[in-house]
Structure formats: structure tokens, C-alpha cells
């Protein structure tokens, strides 16, 4: 009994002490926690680091106190971060979020057929294969030790480690690695294509804006030229009036009656000659009466601000070679010939629908047509505002666009201005010496016009007077040239025009005929001086270079001839017959019976294809449509197709 009572008393005395221990420890810990925060706050406000003791600051003192075991479990890492951010005036939520600029480059979630670990293993394997580390003698020794330490029991089972199974496992592993490499490269290529498409889209938008700016620039440049012309006319009229007051009355009366006073003797002849020359000349428009009297004044005031000649072509430097710039439907039938003055300038097109149309290339605006030919135009050339056209009606017509020769195709206006039975003819001059259809012509920069017809003659014209200067006769040349008299024309090409191609350079004229011969004529003597033999089909196009002659033929080839030796230095084979070719700064554009025009760089032997992209907003071309005529100037290429469409490419 005594022992039991003593045990119960001891237990009753221990119970209160054990129950008070957690309460005392919890209270003490709570007090110490609050006191620690108070001390830290006081230290933060009353102590600061000094240059002498930079290590003594509130943060260092507080962190030093955290090393006490009694406080470590109370102040966790998250509580310290919250305390630090709250005492530095930073919002904890804002400090834990990433800024928006860092979130912009996060790619969208995409499903891939390989994991990150697989991709890393493949790339790491490739890197180890491409740049293996050198094995030293110590590594070789360690390798031998490792090989000798392999447990023999691991390879004792012949059923698992047969040579065939090992080879199969290696091949499977290698195939998996190659598959992953293929997927990685395909993914990278798709990413590159996506970036390129975005860049191309941006580039196209910038080019569209630049084109609009260029059109506005052309419009305001035209307005500026009109205003300057009015200013010059006004100043010239004032000068003429002041000049007339200085004349005696007899001289004025003589001038009114048609007699030329002495003061006008020299100028009258000069201006009369200028008027006759400028009526057709492509160099300058016809001046007004006031301008005739004071032409010297115009020459002295030629320093008026003018638009640069290459202003229109500033856009073309930003295009990629072979890219489509514009496309439009010009005619309803086969385009026989086309030419343009300069990029974003005037474009003239001729077709078998018996129309010749003039366009503004800047905005693809139809300006009007040239009326006068009774049959379709087979060839044409344009220089500035001057156009020469050769037709199957045996005539050559000259047009000066500054003389308002364009027909607006207005039925009401046409019925009022001309009788129904009388054809409209707005040509400035008509050349009628040929007796057969005109099939080729060439217009040089020094105002030399050469035409060729089925009457087997080539004629040189004075474009001012409209007279034929000389005639180059092929019949006479064939009878006196024994080397070319034996060449026969195939029955396949007997219906083709006798002369399809002409070009001139200074006093030299190159002619290409249906028999595949190229003759070089000297205009000073009117005779052929050399013949280039090599083509086996009709010549379709010719163009001179400074030292070479480029020829295209129906024999599916383009030849480059050396003018000094007369031999071909290069032959470019084509898949089909060549319809037209043009050369610009060492790049040759060739239009054949293939769907697209090809550009060949004669220096670097590179080539491009001028194709129309499927995603473009261009018109739908006929399946069998081929380019029939091409022109190439100032990095811009224009081709006309058999379906009547016209395409403009950067080249």
C-alpha cells in the first residue's frame, strides 16, 4: 500500500510539471521571436554601414543572429525573403513575377515527336563524334583496368549477347539517333522557313508602301514640271512683249504681213528648222510660240529644278532578282511586241488583235491606243516619247506622244469627231517605201531607224523628214556572196517572215533571217561585210554588245558571237525555241516557248527564273501561255505572253 501510494503521489506531482513545460517553451519562443524582430527593426533604423566598417549593416547583423539553433526553425527561408522584401519597399508578388519583355520571346506550346533529353543526347553524341577528346596513356591504362574488372558472369549468358543481337541493338540505336537528327533538322528548317516567310511578308509590305510613295513622287513631279513650264511661258511672253516694244512700227507691220524684218532673219530660219525637226523628233516636244522667240532665254533658265532621271527607278534597287512586281491583262490575243521607255514610265504593247496600247507603268493605267494601221503591228520600239511601229500593212508609222496622238477609245467622242467610214489615223508620219509586211525594226539612241520587211530589204530612215536614206537588198547580197547562196530553208519555216530580227550599233546593222544566217551590214557602204553561220533555224532576236552579238533562234539555242573573229564564244542550250532576248549589264533575258523567262548572268554563269508565285494576287494565266516578247532595262524586265498578259519583274 505504501509503495503504491508513493508511486501515485510521485506521478501526481510530475503531471503538472510536464504539462507546464510545453506552455513555458512556447511562450518563451514566441517572446524571443518578437524580441528578435524588434531588435532587427531597431538595428535597421539606427545602424547603417559606414565606409570604415562596410560589413556592419542591419542585414549582416540579422543574418548572423539566424545561426542560433533556437531561432533557426522559426525563421525559414520563405519568411526571411518576405521580411527582406517588405523592409525594402518591394511588393513580394511583383518581385516574384517576370517582366513582360521577358515573356514575349517564349514560344508557343508545340507538340514534338522527341523529348528534350533525346534531343540533347543526339546533339551531345554528334558533338562527341565531331570533336573527340585525345586519349592519353593514363586513360588507356584505366580503360584496360576497367575492361579487366568486368564481371564475367555478365557475358556468360550467350542467349542475350549473341553477335547478331548486339549488331541489331547497335543498328536500332543508330537508326533512332538518325531519326531524331532528322526530326531536329526538319524542325529547325521549318522554323527558318517560318521566319523567312515573315520577313518576306514584311518586305512586301515595305515595297508596297515604297511603290505608293514613288507614285506620289511621280505625280507631284509632273505637277512641278507643269508649273515650271507655265512660269517659263509667262516669263517668255513678258520678254516677247518688252522685245516687241523696242521694234520700229514698220518692222512690226512687216512681221504681221508675213515678211520677216531684218531683226528676225537669222532666228526665223533657225526656228523654222527647229519646228520641222521637233515635229517628229523624240528629243523634245513642240515648243510654244513664245518659247520659239526666246529659246535662248529657255537655255539660260534651264537650271530650273527638275526631277532626276532615275527617280522612277529608285524602287527597283530594293527588289529581289526574278520577283514579280506587277501583272495585268493588256490584250485579248497574242502579244507580238512591246517596249518601255524606262521603269515606271511609258509602256507600249502590240497584239494580233490589231491594237497598239500605251500604258503608264507606275500605276498600270491605260493611257490610250495608237490608231492608223489597217493590220496588226508586228514590231515596235519606243524612245522617250517617240514610238515607231511596223505593221503587216507594209507601213511604218511614227508617233510623238507629246502631240496628243493617243486615241481614248471613247465611242461617243469617236462618232462626233470622225465620220463612220473614215478610219482614225493619228500618226505623226507614215513611211510607205516597203512593198511587203514589215516584220522587224530597230531604233538606236542616235535616232537611226532601221526596218526590215518580207520584200527582202532593210531600209534606213530619216525620222525627221520621213525619207528613206538607203536600202539594203538581200537579193543582191545573196547573188554576190557564194558562201551563203547554198543555204536552203526548211519546209517547216517557209511560212515564217524572211527577216525577224534587226539591231544597230553605230554604222553596223545586224540582220537575222529565216535561213539562220546573221549578216553584218556597214551603213557607210550599204553592203554586208560579214556573215555568222551556226544557227540551223530562223533567227528570232538579235542584240549588240560592245564586243559581242547575242542571237536567239528557233533551233533551241542562244549564241554569243565575237564581233572581231566572227565565231561563237558561248552557246546556251534551251529546251524550246527562242522567241525573244534582251541584254542589260551582262545579264541576258531569254523568252522561249517555256512558261517562264530565264535570266543568265554571262559573267558568273548564274541564272534565275522569272516565275509568278502561286500565292500572288496576279491574274490566272492560261496553261499553255508562253512569253513571246521581252524587254530589259534598268533592272526591270517586262514580258508579253501569248494569252495577252503582261508581267513586270525585277531583274
Swiss-Prot record:
It comes from the Eukaryota. Residues 130-140 have a biased composition (Polar residues). SMART domains: WD40. Residues 1-12 have a biased composition (Basic and acidic residues). Residues 1-21, 125-144 are annotated as: Disordered. WD repeats lie at residues 330-369, 372-409, 433-473, 492-531, 534-573, 575-610, 620-650. Residues 195-229 form a coiled coil. GO terms for biological process: mitochondrial fission; peroxisome fission. SUPFAM superfamilies: WD40 repeat-like (SSF50978). It is a peripheral membrane protein. It is found in: Mitochondrion outer membrane. Keywords: Coiled coil, Membrane, Mitochondrion, Mitochondrion outer membrane, Repeat, WD repeat. Pfam families: WD40. The keyword Glycoprotein does not apply. The keyword Acyltransferase does not apply. GO terms for cellular component: cytoplasmic side of mitochondrial outer membrane; mitochondrion. Involved in mitochondrial fission. Acts as an adapter protein required to form mitochondrial fission complexes. Formation of these complexes is required to promote constriction and fission of the mitochondrial compartment at a late step in mitochondrial division. Belongs to the WD repeat MDV1/CAF4 family. This is Mitochondrial division protein 1.
Amino acid at each position: 500500500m505504501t509503495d503504491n501510494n508513493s508511486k501515485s503521489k510521485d506521478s501526481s506531482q510530475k503531471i503538472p510539471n510536464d504539462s507546464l513545460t510545453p506552455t513555458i517553451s512556447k511562450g518563451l519562443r514566441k517572446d524571443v521571436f518578437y524580441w528578435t524582430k524588434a531588435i532587427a527593426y531597431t538595428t535597421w533604423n539606427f545602424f547603417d554601414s559606414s565606409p570604415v566598417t562596410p560589413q556592419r549593416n542591419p542585414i549582416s547583423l540579422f543574418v548572423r543572429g539566424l545561426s542560433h539553433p533556437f531561432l533557426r526553425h522559426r525563421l525559414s527561408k520563405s519568411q526571411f525573403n518576405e521580411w527582406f522584401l517588405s523592409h525594402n519597399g518591394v511588393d513580394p508578388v511583383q518581385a516574384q513575377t517576370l517582366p513582360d519583355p521577358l515573356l514575349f520571346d517564349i514560344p508557343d506550346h508545340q507538340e514534338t515527336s522527341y523529348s528534350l533529353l533525346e534531343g540533347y543526347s543526339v546533339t551531345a553524341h554528334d558533338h562527341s563524334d565531331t570533336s573527340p577528346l585525345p586519349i592519353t596513356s593514363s586513360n588507356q591504362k584505366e580503360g584496360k583496368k576497367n575492361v579487366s574488372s568486368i564481371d564475367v558472369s555478365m557475358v556468360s549468358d550467350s542467349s542475350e549477347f549473341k553477335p547478331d543481337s548486339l549488331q541489331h541493338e547497335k543498328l536500332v540505336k543508330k537508326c533512332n539517333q538518325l531519326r531524331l537528327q532528322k526530326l531536329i533538322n526538319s524542325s529547325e528548317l521549318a522554323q527558318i522557313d517560318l521566319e523567312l516567310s515573315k520577313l518576306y511578308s514584311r518586305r512586301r509590305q515595305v515595297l508596297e508602301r515604297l511603290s505608293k510613295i514613288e507614285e506620289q513622287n511621280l505625280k507631284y513631279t509632273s505637277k512641278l514640271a507643269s508649273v515650271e513650264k507655265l512660269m517659263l511661258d509667262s516669263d517668255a511672253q513678258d520678254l516677247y512683249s518688252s522685245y516687241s516694244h523696242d521694234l520700229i512700227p514698220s518692222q512690226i507691220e512687216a512681221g504681221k504681213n508675213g515678211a520677216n524684218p531684218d531683226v528676225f532673219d537669222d532666228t526665223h530660219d533657225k526656228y523654222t528648222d527647229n519646228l520641222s525637226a521637233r515635229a517628229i523628233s523624240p528629243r523634245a516636244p513642240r515648243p510654244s510660240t513664245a518659247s520659239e522667240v526666246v529659246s535662248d532665254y529657255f537655255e539660260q533658265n534651264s537650271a530650273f529644278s527638275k526631277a532626276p532621271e532615275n527617280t522612277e527607278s529608285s524602287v527597283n534597287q530594293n527588289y529581289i532578282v526574278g520577283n514579280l512586281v506587277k501583272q495585268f491583262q493588256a490584250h485579248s490575243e497574242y502579244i507580238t511586241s512591246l517596249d518601255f521607255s524606262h521603269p515606271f514610265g511609258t509602256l507600249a504593247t502590240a497584239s494580233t488583235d490589231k491594237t497598239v496600247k500605251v500604258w503608264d507603268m507606275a500605276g498600270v493605267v491605260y493611257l490610250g491606243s495608237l490608231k492608223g494601221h489597217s493590220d496588226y503591228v508586228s514590231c515596235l520600239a519606243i524612245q522617250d516619247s517617240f514610238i515607231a511601229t511596223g505593221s503587216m500593212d507594209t507601213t511604218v508609222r511614227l508617233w510623238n506622244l507629246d502631240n496628243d496622238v493617243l486615241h481614248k477609245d471613247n465611242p461617243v467622242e469617236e462618232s462626233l469627231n470622225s465620220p463612220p467610214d473614215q478610219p482614225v489615223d493619228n500618226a505623226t508620219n507614215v513611211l510607205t517605201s516597203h512593198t511587203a509586211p514589215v516584220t522587224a525594226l530597230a531604233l538606236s539612241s542616235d535616232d537611226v531607224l532601221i526596218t526590215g520587211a518580207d520584200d527582202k530589204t532593210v531600209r534606213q530612215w530619216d525620222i525627221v523628214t520621213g525619207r528613206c536614206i538607203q536600202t539594203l537588198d538581200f537579193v543582191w547580197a545573196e547573188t554576190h556572196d557564194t558562201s551563203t547562196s547554198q543555204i536552203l530553208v526548211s519546209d517547216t519555216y517557209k511560212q515564217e517572215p524572211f527577216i525577224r530580227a534587226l539591231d544597230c550599233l553605230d554604222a553596223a546593222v545586224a540582220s537575222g533571217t529565216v535561213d539562220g544566217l546573221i549578216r553584218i551590214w556597214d551603213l557607210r557602204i550599204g553592203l554586208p561585210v560579214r556573215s555568222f553561220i551556226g544557227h540551223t533555224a530562223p533567227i528570232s532576236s538579235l542584240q549588240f554588245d560592245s564586243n559581242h552579238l547575242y542571237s536567239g533562234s528557233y533551233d533551241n539555242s542562244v549564241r554569243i558571237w565575237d564581233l572581231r573573229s566572227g565565231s561563237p564564244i558561248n552557246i546556251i542550250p534551251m529546251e524550246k525555241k527562242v522567241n525573244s532576248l534582251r541584254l542589260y549589264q551582262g545579264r541576258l533575258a531569254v523568252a522561249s516557248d517555256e512558261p517562264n523567262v530565264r535570266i543568265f548572268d554571262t559573267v558568273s554563269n548564274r541564272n534565275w527564273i522569272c516565275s509568278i508565285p502561286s500565292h500572288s494576287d496576279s491574274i490566272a494565266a492560261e496553261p499553255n501561255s508562253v512569253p513571246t516578247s521581252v524587254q530589259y532595262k534598268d533592272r526591270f524586265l517586262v514580258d508579253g505572253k501569248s494569252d495577252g498578259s503582261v508581267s513586270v519583274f525585277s531583274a
